[in-house]
């Protein structure tokens, strides 16, 4: 695509995968321009949300500004949301316009699938900080009652159990309420 100019690398996302990609590219001597596309120049440290219900952490504690990281790594941040791809992935369509690339890394994370019956009545921590804050607020409002904690498995991969965060929430809430 860029026969006469320097190769352009585009990274989608601002989580662990995206930031590790940037760091490794630079550590291995890559000097090509890197554009990172994400709505905000911040990392949401999701492993720490287990501490929000107890009040040991707040959103402010878990949002890491990335401006200095981008400056150190010589990365251009495009504050935008991705809306699509074209030209076999060589053009990224965003809410701020199109971005051409010679190499594309999609590290935008996964999406939580809300397919379990009744899940619309549940607060699901996998959805991020706002969910953990809702759990915190509901716990503060309670004067008694029952708390149900559960998780579902992937029927296409029955040997894998991904309930770790739910156990962390469960044990943290148990400790908090004792």
Regions found by a protein language model. Name each.
Residues 1-7, 74-176:
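FAD-binding core/adjacent interface of flavoenzyme oxidoreductases
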């Amino acid at each position: 695509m860029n026969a006469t100019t320097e190769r352009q690398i585009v990274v989608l996302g601002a989580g662990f995968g995206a930031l590790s990609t940037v760091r490794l590219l630079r550590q291995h001597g890559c000097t090509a321009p890197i554009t990172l596309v994400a709505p905000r120049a911040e990392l949401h440290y999701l492993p720490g949300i287990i501490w929000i219900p107890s009040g040991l952490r707040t959103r402010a504690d878990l949002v890491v500004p990335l401006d200095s990281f981008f400056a150190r790594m010589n990365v251009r941040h495009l504050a935008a949301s991705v809306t699509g791809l074209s030209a076999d992935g060589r053009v990224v369509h965003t809410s701020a316009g199109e971005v051409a690339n010679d190499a594309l890394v999609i590290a935008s994370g996964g999406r939580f699938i809300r397919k379990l019956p009744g899940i619309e009545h549940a607060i699901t921590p996998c959805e991020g900080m706002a969910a953990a804050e809702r759990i915190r607020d509901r716990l503060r409002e309670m004067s008694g009652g029952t708390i149900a904690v559960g998780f579902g498995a992937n029927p296409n991969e029955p040997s894998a159990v991904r309930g770790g965060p739910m156990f962390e929430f469960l044990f943290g809430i148990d400790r908090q309420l004792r």
